[in-house]
Amino acid sequence: MSSPAYDVIAALKQEGLKPSDWQEICRRLGREPNRAELGMFGVMWSEHCCYRNSRPLLRGFPTEGPRILVGPGENAGVVDLGEGHRLAFKIESHNHPSAVEPFQGAATGVGGILRDIFTMGARPIALLNALRFGPLEDPVNVGLIEGVVAGIAHYGNCVGVPTVGGEVAFDPSYGGNPLVNAMALGLMETEEIVKSGAQGVGNPVVYVGSTTGRDGMGGASFASAELSADSLDDRPAVQVGDPFLEKGLIEACLEAFSGGDVVAAQDMGAAGLTCSCSEMAAKGGLGVELDLDRVPAREEGMTAYEFLLSESQERMLFVVKAGREEALMQRFRRWGLQAAVVGQVLQEPLVRVLHHGEVAAEVPATALADDTPIEQHELLQEPPADLQELWQWQESQLPALDDPASVLLTLLDDPTIASKRWVHRQYDQQVLANTVVSSGAADAAVVRLRPQQGQGSMESVQRGVAATVDCPNRWVALDPERGAQAAVAEAARNLSCVGAEPLAITDNLNFPSPETPKGYWQLAMACRGIAEACRALNTPVTGGNVSLYNETRRDDGTLQPIHPTPVVGMVGLVENIERVVGLGWRQPGDAVLLLGVAPDEQGDDRLGLAGSSYQMLVSGVLAGRPPRVDFELERGVQQLLRQAIDAGLLASAHDSSDGGLAVALAESSIASSLGVELKLNGRPEGLTRTLFAEGGARVAISVKAECRPQWDQLAAESTVPITELGVVNDGSTFRIHCGEKDVQWSLADLKRAHQEGLPRRIGGEAES
């Protein structure tokens, strides 16, 4: 095998590799790599593929539990729901592609996460997403959100999987570097969970799906670098998706898996053929030989380098039982898909690539997909000095609250808090006819669990799966450990608000560069916070995604990092979907109560204004230390919620998060068009904290009037703090008595602020 001369320094820069990487590659190969091999190492040793900066931190996550069937390391995690149901789920990012090509970047992010699900043998049943953008006063950010939402809608709607939930937030730190995290859920249709490790020496390797072109070249390396004004030149690194072809791929794959002839399966996502071959080989402890002359190509004259690094979408690689390949390929062709035998499983644990009858690359599989480099970082022994200084901030530094009425309206108009109907109405939320509760109606989405291809019983149709995505990014920016704990706690609380038992999480760690002391400390502390919270709330981690180098180089050469954003996707089990409650009040006369820290607890460190929406509104300064997460209180509140919902005692439940208690209560009135009269105890000087403080494991509930005796009995058996707030009425006024203050708003004004906040800034139509 020849090693043609090339400019090593330029090639290393193109592949995102360091001089030390070159030395290590040469040591492992015992020779200099050729250009195709260097490209393979470039994508497989990128942060996107091998987590070279984060892998040691991820090992601290709890990954085992009684319901965990598949944990980290496979295409998706799988949990046992009982009664024959098994749920596959995962979250992944497509941040950098969406920054330079928002429509295709977001669309192919959806396609990629769906492939992770059905590659396991699961039929996709729902999609969610977590999105972050810069301020909408900048037309660039308006264009980004329009393109991203349209791309998500296009792919999800066309492939026929409902987008049922998610979150959207805005902050200057995301200007130029939006975050697009896509999560998918699927129900297993096969007896055996399909794994990705190659088995059976001599078994054929079969390529299925779309043809291979030059689109998406170097996408994994691109996703592991900072963004700059020159990043628009990287548009060829963004893939182009075809949701209609993916729909056929879903059906064909599930059909093929059910026949038992597929030994292993791997989708071709980041790093394309290179990643799928090397991962299958490394996980199976064997090797794979790949003949590029047999790979279906859509362009002529493609080099080995281009074949190996192409990230053309809707492609899969299978290891098939010898002798069954032709029948299997005929099945795929009936679905209009390309299918070809492109290689075989080898005894030697290496990836051998043939092109034009010659060996174009030969690399040990583990060098690409298992024994990859780990960056060594020194962890700061104390918080960075700038954060310690910010923690000195006191709530007394905020200006006095003179006009709470206008403040609430302004908060409801904030794009992060305002209604996201402009986003949600572009998604088909009801396709498949299993959506029980979707975006905006409750604190978590709920999907009915129907039997899938003989899996599950007819009695299971009363059961459902709930899902949510959460991250208080401002809290994480101020205290990564507390902020990450809060992300897990809020996700579990949101599931409990619909009556679901939290089961497990998938995480998407969106962070700036880990190469600075502060950057690595933020990542390490957030991982610690997630691990602590998952252990405390019994929600193991089944896998996820790490996206680093989320920062933009300004024109003056300085870097603008995003706020650290560890998005937590959590799933839960609903035993009776008939008992699920939404966030809106249901009927006049129902009592309104608050679970969690009481409104008048002025000195409680579980509640605060640091990192709050109110702080940003009135001061524009992000400072202080966010509230402490009380896991014992969280467990108590969530258990009481689930018990009350299961008993049919509650009419509504809505957690207090962005904007604090006043915003949560207002949102319940807006959702129901019902008025409410509330009394919040508190001193006049503590009015700001009473209305707008965040944290405290708090949930506003309404108890059915006819169920009040049963509720009182249940509450008496609990140690959870419960505060009586008021009563729902059929009026058109939202009124709060707080100490000597008596403040009221018309529901029409609240609705107008909440519903017009986002479309007014984008230029779309407001809700009717």
Swiss-Prot record:
Annotated Mg(2+) 1 binding sites: 92, 545
EC top class named in words: ligase
Superkingdom to which the source organism belongs: Bacteria
Short name of any one Pfam family annotated for the protein: AIRS_C
Keyword list, A-Z: ATP-binding, Cytoplasm, Ligase, Magnesium, Metal-binding, Nucleotide-binding, Purine biosynthesis
Record: active site: 48, 94
EC number: 6.3.5.3
Residues that coordinate or bind substrate: 93-96, 115, 239, 311-313, 547
Family under the similarity heading: Belongs to the FGAMS family.
Protein name, as recorded: Phosphoribosylformylglycinamidine synthase subunit PurL
Organism field: Parasynechococcus marenigrum (strain WH8102)
